[in-house]
Amino acid sequence: MSMSFSFQVEATQGAARAGRMITPHGEVETPVFMPVGTVATVKGIPQDLLEELGVQILLNNTYHLYLRPGVEQIRKLGGTHKFMSWDRSILTDSGGFQVFSLSELRKVTEEGVSFRSHLDGSSHLFSPESAMASQIGIGADIIMAFDECTEYPAERTRTERSMELTLRWAERSKNAFEAHKHEVPWFAERGKKSQALFGIVQGGMFPNLRKESAERTVEIGFPGYALGGFSVGEPREKTAELVANTVPLLPENKPRYLMGVGYPEEIVQYARMGIDMMDCVLPTRAARHGLLFTSEGRLTIKNQRFASDEGPLDPNCSCKVCKRYSRAYLRHLYASNEVLAQVLNTTHNLSYYLDTMRRVRQAIILGENSVSLPVVRSPHLSAT
């Protein structure tokens, strides 16, 4: 089998790294922000526009695609790349976080998680083996080990039990993947390349459990490592502290993925800490609620003060929305509940996130003597 996945660090600045991942569907320059395309669509944005925005890799959600249209349907259609007509890289999560979110509808055992569908109430079981089978059938380039996401707050004994379970599931995920990785829908046409399975570090809000989880997950051995179990209601300062302590425990020659985080100023901060990959629904979800990120701060576009504002959304942004439309028009669309409001707002927010990451990467490559990393001030985060 030819090399399916590689990662190389090309430049560093302090703990921050600029790198390059190669997957069966192309190159990804890191640090990278990955838009979330939950059900094989980034809400409101067609694939050609995602390409135009410079999206290199996006997420699909295993839980949602498993329920609808179903893994077998996607597999028969050639995998998710063909299904959604996207020839660049894709990452799927394992479904663990979504099942965790169904707290009323799920039951966790050693075998896996039994749950009821939020669509029709039908019963299902996700186990490490079935999560691997689903992710292999969907056919993303990067897939995730099946894990249990610990709720917040959680007692230490509960968190430790959960961490131990996740480690056992990581072993089972790896074994199941190794046995079936040649079954990915595009295996033959991509020169017998397969997917890359990442391990997930858990351990809740306890630094010593995070350390143990990181060390033991690295011992199992994966081509990349994710930090999971954040964005579950904990204070952002706590997240930052735990990430800063955990990153140095991960191999320097493997990509590090922080799952489900965060605001623009946070993704800058985490890139500074040495995180290579991040995803978050925030730019798309906030856009649908009229919250827009700009170089001048956050704007709530429905505010009356924008009703006569002829200026662009962000004078420092070169996206097609800022080049063409006024704040007054964007406010009108949002107030009128027009679908175009969602499309334009999301286009701008994604552009802002992607551009922020490009600037961070460029700053790392140029080195600290020429450019400092972009500083985005926020009352929530102390400078690092």
UniProtKB/Swiss-Prot annotation:
Homodimer. Within each dimer, one monomer is responsible for RNA recognition and catalysis, while the other monomer binds to the replacement base PreQ1. Pathway: tRNA modification; tRNA-queuosine biosynthesis. The keyword ATP-binding does not apply. The active site is at D93 (proton acceptor), D279 (nucleophile). Its cofactor is Zn(2+). PANTHER family: QUEUINE TRNA-RIBOSYLTRANSFERASE. It catalyses: 7-aminomethyl-7-carbaguanine + guanosine(34) in tRNA = 7-aminomethyl-7-carbaguanosine(34) in tRNA + guanine. Keywords: Glycosyltransferase, Metal-binding, Queuosine biosynthesis, Transferase, tRNA processing, Zinc. InterPro entries: ArchSynthase1/Queuine_TRR, TGT, TGT-like_sf, tRNA_ribo_trans-like. One of its GO terms (molecular function) is metal ion binding. GO terms for cellular component: cytosol. The keyword Transcription regulation does not apply. Binds 1 zinc ion per subunit. It comes from Koribacter versatilis (strain Ellin345). It is an enzyme of class 2 (transferase). Substrate binds at D93, S94, G95, G96, F97, D147, Q202, G229. Residues 260-266, 284-288 are annotated as: RNA binding. This is Queuine tRNA-ribosyltransferase. Zn(2+) binds at C317, C319, C322, H348.
